[in-house]
């Protein structure tokens, strides 16, 4: 089932006083996006996460939304009346997971390229919800864009994380026994009748916990893509085994 995590916004402002004395110019917004990507991956590596890779369709969704906020000076995850999931889908990205960070920054003295990239990245990193998105272990793709309002000079940044639907985990739970069984998958309970099979598709790592009839302790496993777990009765006892798919 596709997952859309809770989306959090960050608004950061720099007062003229704190900007005094710094070198300013017109930031290269394409370079800012590249630097934010590099710094995001550095932070992920520092926390033991795999780096994410730029995805053209996520980049397109980020550019479109950043440009909209810059044109309208409307700010928020649904500023255009749509969700991040709807925007990435419109660009042809079929997602299993999609997460979004946004930021709004302004300084009357402007920003340099390096400074703007640093403020965007650190602003997200210092916010628990945004940092959680940046460190999500199961996203693989990223899209980043920054746009500036011609009216107010405000910069709007969008960072999208995604995992394609094609990378979902698919596995089966089979009950070859003559009795119904109960099991939990990531905390959700299921009942499986005798001699029946159920297929599951998950976007995140799954934990399967099976309660076997007559056994006091449940059995927990982490299914991989293509796995088949089968409950069978051997003599008077029930057992769970990983069967050939």
Where are these regions (language model features)?
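Asparagine-centered strand-capping/turn motif at beta-strand->loop junctions
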Residues: 169-180
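Short domain-boundary/entry signatures in modular proteins, especially
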Residues: 160-170
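Bacterial N-terminal signal peptides
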Residues: 2-13
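A short, solvent-exposed beta-strand micro-motif common in secreted/extracellular proteins
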Residues: 204-217
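Short, well-ordered surface patches within globular domains
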Residues: 20-88, 137-143
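A well-ordered secondary-structure block
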Residues: 84-162
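Extracellular beta-sheet/turn segments enriched in Thr/Pro/Gly and aliphatic residues
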Residues: 217-245
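Short, solvent-exposed S/T- and G/P-enriched segments that are highly enriched in secreted/extracellular
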Residues: 186-202, 219-225
